[in-house]
Amino acid sequence: MIDLRLLREDPDAVRASQRARGEDPALVDALLEADAARRAAVATADNLRAEQKAMSKQIGKAPKEERSALLARAQELSVKVKEAEAAQHAADADLDAAHRALSNVVLPAVPAGGEDDYVVLETVGTPPEFDFEPKDHLELGEALGLMDMERGAKVSGSRFYFLTGHGALLQLGLLQLAAQKAVANGFTMMIPPVLVRPEVMAGTGFLGRHAAEVYHLADDDMYLVGTSEVPLAGYHADEILDLSAGPKRYAGWSSCFRREAGSYGKDTRGIIRVHQFDKVEMFVYTTPDQAEAEHERLLAWEREMLAAIEVPYRIIDVAAGDLGSSAARKFDCEAWVPSQQTYRELTSTSNCTTFQARRLSVRYRDENGKPQIAATLNGTLATTRWIVAILENHQRADGSVRVPAALVPFVGTDVLRPPA
């Protein structure tokens, strides 16, 4: 949720953010009205309670002959207090609903526009030039015995797969390398739950316009997470953190689940867009004034991992209209995919400012000991999709694939060849 002080002091900035996202600026006016109504309801209830308290004192001091009339007045006042408190509770609920309907306020540097209006910040490496017709990752993966889409579909349906043999080792190697780098950079390694309560899923902002992407277990009213960002965001819900020594950094290793409800017909081949994958995700709690610097650090750690797998990539500043509701700014790292002759996302890192922490009531104490809302950030350190970039960029004319040196200790070989 956004800061209501910003809303009251500069509603035009919030309206501009909504327009930049391609969302309805009228939601800002609805929130302003709900905020005003709630404050009026609180004032009415407070005044009536004060009057009721004064009446109680008056009755205690009144002569016997006056008490009957005062008691009747007190009963009338009691009814009004209950009505005012009910109105206040209703106003609280209306304010909360209006507050949650609004996306985070984008930062000033975010590019305007939609999905195709990103800004390329840097291009790293050069796409390989093959003297043969390169294969796509699925053809390579199946020929090398790394993945089995057909049996994945037989067992679970479309967009499911088996990673087999060295394919499984390649994924485990990626995730273990990411875990090692995370720990070396001061992160606490976590294996979180992948089922969360509705309030945690809602708190991270995933039950808004992207709710259709989330798997819901109706009988248990639990949600399967699409990223370990969700349980890690809920880890310190309703707590006051000590950030005096610096940010709290966690790296979550989990399976992730996405319905891909809006992706019918897109990336149906291979493992680029699937319902289940594994990922190591960085998650940080920090103070709001340090959030932008921390965002740059997360990007730098992602770059370290991408350098380790030796693939060409670019960094983009995602446009406002393509941001998730909780992100105030997002950088994506996209690797070159030879079979598609384009770049595809491998990592994203988002600065969510105080949006998630306000929803989840995560605070810290400032230098005066006063509780303040924390800031949260997240970023990908490795995921299943990286296998696509590794196979396609490191393939050779004979159909084998070179294993990046950093992954050789995990995979057990420096070249992937078809099984004998």
Curated annotation (Swiss-Prot):
Pfam families referenced in this protein's UniProt entry, alphabetically: Seryl_tRNA_N, tRNA-synt_2b
Keyword hit for Protein biosynthesis: yes
InterPro entries recorded: aa-tRNA-synt_IIb, aa-tRNA-synth_II, aa-tRNA-synth_II/BPL/LPL, Ser-tRNA-ligase_type_1, Ser-tRNA-synth_1_N, SerRS_1_N_sf, SerRS_core, tRNA-bd_arm
UniProt entry tagged with the keyword Mitochondrion: no
Domain of life of the native organism: Bacteria
EC number(s) reported in the record: 6.1.1.11
Cell compartment(s), UniProt: Cytoplasm
Residues that coordinate or bind ATP: R258, R259, E260, V274, E345, L346, T347, S348
GO molecular function: ATP binding; serine-tRNA ligase activity
UniProt binding sites for L-serine: T227, S228, E229, E281, T380
Functional pathway: Aminoacyl-tRNA biosynthesis; selenocysteinyl-tRNA(Sec) biosynthesis; L-seryl-tRNA(Sec) from L-serine and tRNA(Sec): step 1/1
GO terms, biological process: selenocysteine biosynthetic process; seryl-tRNA aminoacylation
Reaction(s) catalysed (UniProt annotation): tRNA(Ser) + L-serine + ATP = L-seryl-tRNA(Ser) + AMP + diphosphate + H(+); tRNA(Sec) + L-serine + ATP = L-seryl-tRNA(Sec) + AMP + diphosphate + H(+)
Top-level EC class as recorded in UniProt: ligase
Entry keywords, A to Z: Aminoacyl-tRNA synthetase, ATP-binding, Cytoplasm, Ligase, Nucleotide-binding, Protein biosynthesis
Gene Ontology cellular component terms for the protein in this record: cytoplasm
Quaternary assembly: Homodimer. The tRNA molecule binds across the dimer.
Function of the protein: Catalyzes the attachment of serine to tRNA(Ser). Is also able to aminoacylate tRNA(Sec) with serine, to form the misacylated tRNA L-seryl-tRNA(Sec), which will be further converted into selenocysteinyl-tRNA(Sec).
Family: Belongs to the class-II aminoacyl-tRNA synthetase family. Type-1 seryl-tRNA synthetase subfamily.
NCBIfam families noted in UniProt: serS
Entry domain remark: Consists of two distinct domains, a catalytic core and a N-terminal extension that is involved in tRNA binding.
Name of protein: Serine--tRNA ligase
Species the sequence originates in: Nocardia farcinica (strain IFM 10152)
